[in-house]
Amino acid sequence: MTVRTRVAPSPTGDPHVGTAYIALFNRCFAQQHGGQFILRIEDTDQTRSTDQSEQMILDSLKWLGLTWDEGPDVGGPHGPYRQSERKGIYRQYAEQLIEKGHAFKCYRTSEELDALRAGLKESGENRALKPSDLELPADEQAKREADGAPYVIRMRVPTEGRCEIHDMLRGPVELDWALVDAQILLKSDGMPTYHLANIVDDHLMEITHVIRGEEWLNSAPKHKLLYEYFGWEMPVLCHMPLLRNPDKSKLSKRKNPTSILFYQRMGYLPEALVNYLGRMGWSMPDESEKFSLTQMQEAFDIQRVSLGGPVFDVEKLSWLNGQWLREQSDEQFLDSLLDWAFNRDYAMKIIPHLRQRVETLSEVADKAAFCFNGMPAISEASFEHKQYSADDIKVWLQYLLWTYEARNDWNREGLFADAKAIADALEVKIKDFLFPVFIAIAGTSASFSVVDSMEIIGSDISRARIRHAIEVLGGVSKKQMKKLEKAYRDLPVG
């Protein structure tokens, strides 16, 4: 048997360090066993998936050295490797389940589903919706079918008993069938959900080991059941502990920069970031803190993974990155510096905005410094405004941060539209509203267009700088945050 592992990111935003973390452990496991590592793109969410995001994922993983044997860019015998290009395959298997009596068409409306869930809550029943709750009387089913009403395909699940899952790290895990819902397999637009697509793809792509985040452990009974329904052998499951913020909460962009691009633009070495991710819940046999990808692959043993939630601490990553930098030769350091600071693609984004604003090349370093720096050197005094207080400005920035955190695509038109919508809702002139954004992003209001600047430096650095500015202005307490969240929800935006 050839060991085959995979990573299957969704191209719905910036490439996440969590994707790199899972890719790293999948790649190391495959390498350890002389196997193959596959990259598959989960782009079934057509409203949020973008080609730009997919390319950033590919570029970021390559930058880290986490290359793959098969994937959408390199091809392979099990393609296509984008789920959107496999739509017909999923429908074929979903209909096969209906024919075998393992799935059914569900014509329930969203209002009916809400009422069913409310009924369960009122009755105090601690269980999920089951086929018996969802199936309509035969005459009503026939009527909706004849009317061409939209439907989804759901799987049948047991109503009682327990399901035992074997996990490589945890051993046997028991889960209650009562809490497992009649999962949607095929949506009304014909696209599959994660649950159907991954089982079908993992089988057809001959995946032998599924190494994924522990958030999928509760879904494992559905997956085991689908393998049984199809009569397929189930891959070995291994659920990795989730990355955590220093406060032990799940790693999220609201508390920590999560984009690989952020760390690339901030000047972290790819070797250091891979090294740090390798220490997330795993350790070398000799307990060494600094090691290369090659060294990790040679010493890798999945059983050395600890189930305690590994903490992703940027300060510790910075310390480790410093260790890597200090051990470089002068030539290596110069090469790293030139590759980072004079990256041609990045520089070409800046130059069109810079060329019109300088008279000598010696001015470039000062005017473009914010494109290369970390956090701008700002104070509360930097935000002084004739008409608005620091508290006013702090609220604006918090509203803008929340809006930008919800944005999937990152372009100047969308960024400006978001800022304008909030300014209009607050009845603030856009010029006044953008003043503190200039300060937060560039450290000065004497810069080229702030939306152009944010598009250039990217989403994670932009959000991190706005978050930093809010802290400089005194931050927001938990009590204030609740009030602001309500006020933000009530904003007449859009």
UniProtKB/Swiss-Prot annotation:
Its EC number is 6.1.1.17. A motif ('HIGH' region) lies at residues 9-19. Coiled coil: none annotated. It comes from Alcanivorax borkumensis (strain ATCC 700651 / DSM 11573 / NCIMB 13689 / SK2). It catalyses: tRNA(Glu) + L-glutamate + ATP = L-glutamyl-tRNA(Glu) + AMP + diphosphate. The keyword Nucleotidyltransferase does not apply. ATP binds at K253. It is found in: Cytoplasm. One of its GO terms (molecular function) is zinc ion binding. It is an enzyme of class 6 (ligase). PANTHER family: GLUTAMATE--TRNA LIGASE (PTHR43311), GLUTAMATE--TRNA LIGASE, MITOCHONDRIAL-RELATED (PTHR43311:SF2). GO terms for cellular component: cytosol. Catalyzes the attachment of glutamate to tRNA(Glu) in a two-step reaction: glutamate is first activated by ATP to form Glu-AMP and then transferred to the acceptor end of tRNA(Glu). GO terms for biological process: glutamyl-tRNA aminoacylation. CDD domains: GluRS_core (cd00808). This is Glutamate--tRNA ligase.
